[in-house]
Each structure stands twice: as C-alpha cells, then as structure tokens.
Amino acid sequence: MRHYEIVFMVHPDQSEQVAGMIERYTGSITEAGGTIHRLEDWGRRQMAYPINKLHKAHYVLMNVESEQAAIDELETAFRYNDAVLRNMIMRTKAAITEPSVMMKAKEERTAKREDAAPRAEEAAAE
C-alpha cells in the first residue's frame, strides 16, 4: 500500500455537510483496506485567489495509506461532487501523523489565549 496526502476544498455554503463528506470519504478508504493516519478539518479559510467568484472555502486534510483503486474511487467522488471546488492527491514516501503547520499555529494561538485569560482575571482582581 502507498501513502497519500489529500487536501480538498468544499464550497462555503456546504460547510454543514463537510462532516458527512469526511465520513463518506474515510469510509470508502477503510472499506478498501486502507488506514487514515491524519485527518484535519481546517475550517473555512480565505483562498489565495477566487474560484467561481468565491473567496472562501472549507479545507480538509487527510493522510492515508491505501491501494491505488481506492484513491481512484475517491478522485472520482471528488470529480462528481459539485461541492468540492478543488482537490489535490499527492503520493508521499511515509505516513505523516504529526499535526500540520496549520494546526500547530492554531494550537499555539489557543494556548496563548488560555494563558492570557488568567492574567487578565488577576489584573482585574487587583
């Protein structure tokens, strides 16, 4: 089996259906005997350039280990789903399990906010 990194962008009006789409796509990979090493929902983000007059999209990242047939099936599902604006499937040399740069930055921001909240409460109490 080979390792793949998959990123797909969903129409912002379809953000509510992203969880179902992720479940469907991961299900098709696991049914074919593949495994999901990393799954990150980056949420709605600004795009670098407009696509179909849209400036935002819902981003999802998956790192999987699967056979080529399952990846072909997934690519076909992306192609026929109108809600998927763009997708990218790259073959990688090994499984990537650590958080991506996007998620690391998000975790750092939330940690800073959590650290700042007790300090603000202490300053208000004095």
Curated annotation (Swiss-Prot):
PANTHER family: MITOCHONDRIAL 28S RIBOSOMAL PROTEIN S6, SMALL RIBOSOMAL SUBUNIT PROTEIN BS6M. Binds together with bS18 to 16S ribosomal RNA. GO terms for biological process: translation. InterPro entries: Ribosomal_bS6, Ribosomal_bS6_sf, Ribosomal_S6_plastid/chlpt, Transl_elong_EF1B/ribsomal_bS6. Residues 101-126 are annotated as: Disordered. It comes from the Bacteria. The lineage of its organism: Bacteria, Pseudomonadati, Pseudomonadota, Gammaproteobacteria, Vibrionales. GO terms for cellular component: cytosolic small ribosomal subunit. This is Small ribosomal subunit protein bS6. One of its GO terms (molecular function) is small ribosomal subunit rRNA binding. Keywords: Ribonucleoprotein, Ribosomal protein, RNA-binding, rRNA-binding. Pfam families: Ribosomal_S6. Belongs to the bacterial ribosomal protein bS6 family. It comes from Aliivibrio salmonicida (strain LFI1238) (Vibrio salmonicida (strain LFI1238)). Residues 104-126 have a biased composition (Basic and acidic residues).
